[in-house]
Amino acid sequence: GKGSVSAFLRSMAEAAGLSCHVYNSPHLCRFNERIRLNGNFISDDELIDVLSEVEGVNGSDPITFFESTTVAAFLAFSRHPADLLILETGLGGIFDSTNIVPDTACTIITPIAFDHEQFLGSDIATIARQKAGIMRSGRPSIWARQQPEAYAQLQQQARQLCVYVQTEGPVSYTHLRAHET
């Protein structure tokens, strides 16, 4: 799933000598696991500082737990230089708080299944349309094997955005243009 993919990417980046920040959810044992700064989990002190800062700036405006955690992570990331940032979506899709980054290098879509149905939809095609919302125009997107109805939705969005798509198999990209069928 998403967590395994982000762990694998982080491992490859660090093995290549890159400094890397990672945002994951949910955590396994400690909340600090959600925010990794250059290979290390955020310290308790820094976590308290960024969460307090987010709470102070936000005031009494409505904000979800995931949104405040995401903002705290971005705040921590902004204070530590890194070569690479790996973001794992929470709900995964159009309305996910991690989806505010306008210019991603690449997106990865793991197998789409029934999850977060109250937010994403009650059928695979609807969920896939939501998850396709992380793709960016002209940027590569790597997809795990998908159910046919999910694949069709991903492909439709990829065409609209002229996304380079890599699915299972050797590394080569298919550039889906809006006029292709």
Regions found by a protein language model. Name each.
Residues L28-R30, F114-Q118, Y173:
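Short gly/pro/ser/thr-enriched loop/turn and capping motifs at secondary-structure boundaries
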Residues L9, A73, L154, T174:
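Aromatic/hydrophobic pocket-lining residues that form π-stacking "cages" and hydrophobic walls in ligand
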Residues S4-S19:
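A conserved segment at the C-terminal end of the G1
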Residues C20, S141, Y164-V165:
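Hydrophobic beta-strand scaffold residues
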Residues A15-P102, L120, P148-E149:
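ATP-dependent carboxylate-amine ligase catalytic core
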Residues G90-S97, V101-Q160:
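Conserved catalytic-core segment of NTP-binding enzymes
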Residues T174-T181:
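Conserved small/polar residues in nucleotide/adenosyl-binding loops
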Residues G1-V5, T110, T174:
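Conserved adenylation A10 loop of the ANL superfamily
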